Amino acid sequence: MSEHQTPPEEDLTVANGDSAEAVSEPDVTVASGQEAAELAAQLALVAADRDRLKTELDEQNSAYLRLAADFENFRRRTLKEREELELQSKRTTITELLPVIDNFDRARAQIKPQGEEAEAIHKSYQGLYKQLVDCLKRIGVSPMRAEGQPFDPSLHDAVLREETTEHPDGIVLEELQRGYLLGDLVLRHALVKVSIAAEENSAAVTE
């Protein structure tokens, strides 16, 4: 029998298989590297798209906030202008009615009805006067009460001055024409007579 024997076929197959695996391992490594590079490139594209979309979203949000702020400012400005227009219209209308109130006030002070018929007429127009005053009161109109109050140039117009020892300087002695307010807004200044303190006036003349 020869010393060099042919190995069994099974052994040859195993040996050949190990050799095949050893040869194919570099190809697998190269393929894995390419896939990783492609995946990294795709991730970079996704990240870039994400950043771009985030930037666009931020810009759209900023544009929306600016638009909302502009609309709110427009709404407030329009509302304020409408309120001012309504107030000015109301003020103009009421101011036109004030002379009518003045005439009623003068009639009440001067007319002394004589007889039943005159008294009936007097009560009739006094009823109209009351209706008018109540209507003005409901929309916020109120008369000033100037007499006895310190003179206030924002409310009063001094058309007369009178020296007196009974009041300090700058007190409204008489209301010559009634002033009116619409809420806090002056509809018409009161025309008044204002005191001049006699002692202060005498001291000024002496000096």
UniProtKB/Swiss-Prot annotation:
Compartments where located: Cytoplasm
Keywords: Chaperone, Cytoplasm, Stress response
GO molecular function: adenyl-nucleotide exchange factor activity; protein homodimerization activity; protein-folding chaperone binding; unfolded protein binding
Biological processes, Gene Ontology terms: protein folding
Pfam families hit by this protein: GrpE
One cellular component term from this protein's GO annotations in UniProt: cytoplasm
PROSITE patterns associated with the record: GRPE
Region ranges (Disordered): 1-31
Classification via InterPro entries: GrpE (IPR000740), GrpE_coiled_coil (IPR013805), GrpE_head (IPR009012)
Domain of life from the UniProt record: Bacteria
Physiological role: Participates actively in the response to hyperosmotic and heat shock by preventing the aggregation of stress-denatured proteins, in association with DnaK and GrpE. It is the nucleotide exchange factor for DnaK and may function as a thermosensor. Unfolded proteins bind initially to DnaJ; upon interaction with the DnaJ-bound protein, DnaK hydrolyzes its bound ATP, resulting in the formation of a stable complex. GrpE releases ADP from DnaK; ATP binding to DnaK triggers the release of the substrate protein, thus completing the reaction cycle.
Quaternary organization: Homodimer.
Family as reported in the entry's similarity comment: Belongs to the GrpE family.
Name by which UniProt lists this protein: Protein GrpE
